Amino acid sequence: MAEEEDVLFQRFAKIFIGCLAAVTSGMMYALYLSAYHERKFWFSNRQELEREITFQGDSAIYYSYYKDMLKAPSFERGVYELTHNNKTVSLKTINAVQQMSLYPELIASVLYQATGSKEIIEPVYFYIGIVFGLQGIYVTALFVTSWLMSGTWLAGMLTVAWFIINRVDTTRIEYSIPLRENWALPYFACQIAALTGYLKSNLNTYGERFCYLLMSASTYTFMMMWEYSHYLLFLQVISLFLLDIFSVEQSDKVYEVYKIYIFSLFLGYLLQFENPALLVSPLLSLVAALMLAKCLQLNVKKGSFVAKIIKVINFYLVCTLTITLNIIMKMFVPHKENGHMLKFLEVKFGLNMTKNFTMNWLLCQESLQAPSQDFFLRLTQSSLLPFYILVLIICFLSMLQVIFRRINGKSLKETITLEDGRIGERPEIIYHVIHTILLGSLAMVIEGLKYIWIPYVCMLAAFGVCSPELWMTLFKWLRLRTVHPILLALILSMAVPTIIGLSLWKEFFPRLMTELMELQEFYDPDTVELMTWIKRQAPVAAVFAGSPQLMGAIKLCTGWMVTSLPLYNDDDLLKRNENIYQIYSKRSAEDIYKILTSYKANYLIVEDAICNEVGPIRGCRVKDLLDIANGHMVCEEGDKLTYSKYGRFCHEVKINYSPYVNYFTRVYWNRSYFVYKINTVISFQS
């Protein structure tokens, strides 16, 4: 009896210390982000306009709608104005909530007003505080996932350490707080933690129910927070499908997870204003195909030749049904969603060539290119990449070993002990190996996906070096005889992470402290002057035209209407962006005037940084991409060069001579910006 009490006490103490460490890690990371953000932007010493300028591009748009919700007389009125928004983009009414996934802003505005925070904290601090808090939950979820897989909270501590040290590659929170991924990925991390626990073979009934409920809630929330979430869940379903093939024992559990996806898609479709993108998504087609195939599956003796044939037929059936269902859905469901994404992928993988400005501009973005050598060097210097590769190889080979044993009809143990050394037989390990390979393969093509992949690299590497099972699997292969393998595995699972942790502390902790001590300065006086002039001098009904990134800042800082936005999920907005960018091309004053007046623009803003851009890669500057699209620059051999008799508009308009002064009158300028009033009555001067 006393022994049982001791065991229960030890287990409780282990869980308590682990939970305390997980929560503390998340809280410390959130506080670190807050302190670093203050040091970088000096928020507490700045005026509201100067704070808002720190939100760049699409981040400015998201935060501007949060401000609009707080200004609305009621929540219902605020939602209505966002869903029928005609005060942002000229000549266009948009459902901003659906198109931009503004559910985070709706929730943040409700919480701000419902909690009475208006008297305590400014709206901007409340907003970024929620995001930093979610990042703390993100880190806590990664901690728990690694802990569940390895059995020791030491793995969670190492996961957090690697995550923070490699934060340049794990998160974009430092550069752009309101991004959808910063709101969504913490819920995805919670979902993966719950899924990991749910897939474990030794979980009790209450644990399964808790994990299932947490998985359901986090899957749905993740889907609501980010418009691209269903693509990430699609990769997850592929991983679960392959797990179902390789691990017969988990078939029923995997089928229950499929129901979560169907429920989340159905609820998301209704609450996202009947979003057609969810109906035509590959996620829905694949899950529906898997559930249909499950209904048609025959019960035969496991390990028999017939069972193997049925597995192959089932795989082929699922693939065929998925493609068929997706084609049928696209035939009957009207949609325009993400057509530009397919075109981009065609060009990215060399399946098509284009001179289109938007496609080439996207290809030139650093986040959409292949990873650089610096990326791999950073991961190697922090010791993350070498240990990840080691852990992945051992788990992958062990998984293959288990698969071949199944193919040969050999029975597997119901309970796996440490002495067996078969880490690849655990269903949660099989899932994570497949998932990380899929994510890693995509991240090798598109660098921006590293922010999804690297956090799980941290988690998997930390789990591996802290897992006695992984070391035991390696020793089984090496047939170690000199030292007792179980004892050595237990020692290494404690010693290796301790040595890694101490080396990381010695090398990187002083750097983190130095970053918090250093006062950085982000100040853009030219943009502040421009926004101040607009608010004081421009008519309230004025419409501004310029680069999409600048238009986002104008919408946030002034509230004035603009002609375009830095959003890339709408074909009309993409076309607008391309047309407005023509102010940096070799087009006539009359052409530019017609383009701008077609969007009812009253003012044009020319940015000196774009007009005189000296980019590191020739052909990736905005003016080069425009010249290629307009045929004024040779892109490939055999292209026909079209000579333009006009100079570059952004240069010519500054000189103030006819015909440019007939159409445009300069009303304001500073070192970075030139503002021109678009004349309604054209006066021709000689």
From Swiss-Prot:
The chain crosses the membrane at residues 15-35, 124-141, 147-165, 210-226, 232-248, 255-273, 279-300, 312-333, 384-404, 429-449, 452-472, 485-505. The keyword Membrane applies. Its main location: membrane. Signal peptide: none annotated. GO terms for molecular function: mannosyltransferase activity. It is found in: Membrane. The modification N-acetylalanine is found at residue 2. GO terms for cellular component: nuclear inner membrane. Keywords: Acetylation, Glycosyltransferase, Membrane, Transferase, Transmembrane, Transmembrane helix. Its EC number is 2.4.1.-. It holds the Pfam family Dpy19. It is a multi-pass membrane protein. It is an enzyme of class 2 (transferase). Probable C-mannosyltransferase that mediates C-mannosylation of tryptophan residues on target proteins. PANTHER family: C-MANNOSYLTRANSFERASE DPY19L4-RELATED, DPY-19-LIKE 1, LIKE (H. SAPIENS). Belongs to the dpy-19 family. This is Probable C-mannosyltransferase DPY19L4. It comes from Pongo abelii (Sumatran orangutan).
